[in-house]
Amino acid sequence: MRLFFLIAFAFFLSYCSAQVRVLNSDLFSSFEHLDSCLLRLYSPEEYPDFKVLHIGDSHVQGVYWGGQLRERLSENRNAKQSGFLFPYSAVKSYGPKGLKASLTGNWIGGNWLKENGITEFGLGGYSLKAVDESAKIDWQIEKTLFGDTVRYVGIWHKGNMRIDSTFLLLNHRLVEGCNIQYSLYLNTTLKREFSLESGCDGYQFFGLNLASDTDGFEYHKCGLVGAQFTHMIQSVDQWKNELKLWNPDLVILSFGTNEAYNGFMDTLAYENKVRDLMRAWNDEQPQSSFMVTAPPNTSSRNRIPPYENFMIRVWRRQCLENGWGYFDLHEAMGGDSSWSKWLKLGYMGTDQLHFKSSGYSLQADIVVHSIRSYVRDKWPGVQLVEEDWERETEALLASIYTMKNPLLDSPPQAKTRTHVVRSGETLSSIGRKYGIPYTAIQKANNLRGTTIYPGQKLRIPH
């Protein structure tokens, strides 16, 4: 009998340990305001169509984070659309690979950060404006970008345009109060090379969508390198009208990385703007659900971002007050200084601001695994099995959480001191303070130039 109880107790312990999750979503997420949205997402037979609109900074514009989010969110769904595309290289930005756009005639490009008073901007962040009627864009779509058949092409634009004669217009969407329109074409010859000409002086192009099927799951990522939330909020009235044009089921906002390094942050004004946008979108788009991901932990140029934790607090507070979903990516990574672990493990780029493909993929897996765990716990009847990649995510997080922080574990650097840069200081003034040439500080910190920033940590050699 005693042996029986010992075996039963051991089984109970093993069962309990199997239920323990490294990723305790309750600590850094709030999904209850997304209940109806998540039920639709994970009921594909009842709700076959589902649209996600993801807006943010360079983390979103890049390929890897959004690509992995799209793949994980669309599991067991019909996902036959590329999502929002823009020829970023045409406006001196980056990517996307596999989308070639050759511009002829006169075009003016711009984005939220570089307003020129000539071009307008949509939620995609970028635009191209034709200065004459002969302006043209020749497109080439490679299979590395979109492997499915290009049966449909959707275009966000303003003004009249001309497209190849083999393209038939199927649908043209306009929304009152929104300057942007969406035109959907049938590509009758399924070709991957076509031309788009401006049909009027002032024609504007905002984005492209490729599809082999117009039904099913859609994930549109609209990112802008260097973007801050305050850049987007400048046109809040336009955005709420454009949101009606998109009509998404779920909107995800991912800002805060660039603001975290802003040395001139008006914290009160920032939070008021966050609140204003949330209330406006709640009022104008009640059929959509909204979610925010907090910025990841970073350390660009060896600086501690002074407003990173402020961003996290503001977004969490306003999400709770306004009924938005929330995910604290900073905490899920491991909290303050966790960037050093991600860097050592090869997940983070050497700029200590962006992540490698493996890092972005892991972050996407963390977000979606957390959502799936919430759905399984809340609705046991939903057939959502735990996938192998979810267990692998748990294992990777366990190794990160239990790993010693390299910043604390590293031996002290011999013959060096640390100086935290203050506002107004230069390399020369710091060098004079310590009685050494500024070039010695440059060399000790691998600085290419003389630009330094408040909050940046510098090694000062003896």
Task: Go through each PLM region and give its residues.
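Membrane/wall-proximal cationic-aromatic binding patches
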Residues: 20-54, 108-109, 116
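Solvent-exposed, polar/charged alpha-helical surfaces in well-ordered, non-transmembrane soluble domains
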Residues: 63, 67, 71, 241, ...
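Bacterial Sec-dependent N-terminal signal peptides
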Residues: 1-23
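Catalytic His-Asp segment of secreted/periplasmic serine-dependent ester chemistry enzymes
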Residues: 236, 298-407
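Short, surface-exposed beta-strand/strand-loop-strand elements in extracellular ectodomains
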Residues: 161-172
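Conserved, compact domain cores that house catalytic/ligand-binding motifs in diverse enzymes
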Residues: 48-56, 61-65, 216-321, 325-327, ...
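Primarily a LysM-type cell-wall glycan-binding module
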Residues: 402-443, 448-462
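Conserved SGNH/GDSL esterase-like catalytic core that processes O-acyl groups on lipids
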Residues: 61-162, 176-272, 354
